[in-house]
Amino acid sequence: PDLKERYGYGGFVHLEHHRTGCARMMRDDHFFREVGDNCWSPERRLEDCDRDGVTVQVLSTVPVMFSYWARPGDTDDLARLLNDDLAGSVAVNPGRFVGLGTLPMNAPDLAVQELTRCVRELGFAGVQIGSHVNGLNLDAPELFPVFQCAAELGAAVFVHPWDMLGAGRMEKYWLPWLVGMPAETAVAVCSILFGGVLERLPDLRIGFAHGGGSFPHTIGRIQHGFEVRPDLCAVDNQVGPREYLGRFYLDSLVHDQAALRYLVDLVGADRIALGSDYPFPLGEHAPGALIESLDDLAEEGRNRMLWGTAEEFLGLEPGRFLP
């Protein structure tokens, strides 16, 4: 639908189909990016999956569509539209697709309702949320009921960076995606840990995109800061961040063998799931290739990262999708 017409104001993303199999993502009259039909066509996605040897793909909303900035009721309405559309794709191909819904996180009460609908009515494995909500970090008390609901439902929560910090200084060189996203994800991880969300909800299954961003690679600095300035870092939770390593999930999308080996050493292969960022340029164009390239990785660890960890994180029956 025309979202500007539907809600009475602009700022929403829409597609301009300017040629076959291709569209421009536009925010009002401003160009955002060009995308192919694998962004909206399940059939095209399955063709790519078959080409790349991907048995199952997890579907989620493009983060630019989160629209947390909009009026709460409108964000909720849009989330329902997006989730219903995604559920339709999963329903037609239940052996190939798994769904993660989107939520109106700018209205936590509505987010709880939509999360419940996503799991109980639409059959989704969980939800994808942004790294912050209009400047509120994920430890904000207002957001806690959403995480609590996810834990109670046994739903996975996947955190993806969006609306990156420092945007005004990063207009050149694609820096929001190259530098801003890893930093944004690190802020999200630290907010969850320092804020005590996992301490209060030990059963919450939460994962972070892009290998946890810069967090894993600065854990020494973060832990040291926690120890030397508890007056600043331990104000909401007295448990150090290192104690939580292995209690949350990361994906494997780090683009570098040494970085992936480091993640395996840090959190274990059983906490790392294959991440592809399909179908965008920063994704892994041959999903799983980096994992497969680690010759020194035991078969058990490789299988965990290729499919086993994802099954666990998403709460899927082990071996459900194996031939």
Language-model region placement:
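Histidine/acidic-residue-rich catalytic or RNA/ligand-binding cores of hydrolases
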Residues: 68, 167-174, 212-227, 260-267, ...
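Acidic-and-aromatic substrate-binding clefts and catalytic sites of carbohydrate-active enzymes
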Residues: 36-40, 67, 105-111, 134-141, ...
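Aromatic-lined glycan-binding groove of carbohydrate-active enzymes
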Residues: 193-196, 200-245
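Active-site gating loops and adjacent loop-to-helix segments of metal-dependent hydrolytic enzymes
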Residues: 1-37, 164-185, 222-245
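Mid-to-C-terminal alpha-helical segments outside catalytic/metal-binding sites
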Residues: 1-56, 84-92, 113-117, 204, ...
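Active-site gating/metal-coordination segments in enzymes
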Residues: 55-195
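Histidine-centered divalent metal-coordination motifs
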Residues: 1, 160, 210
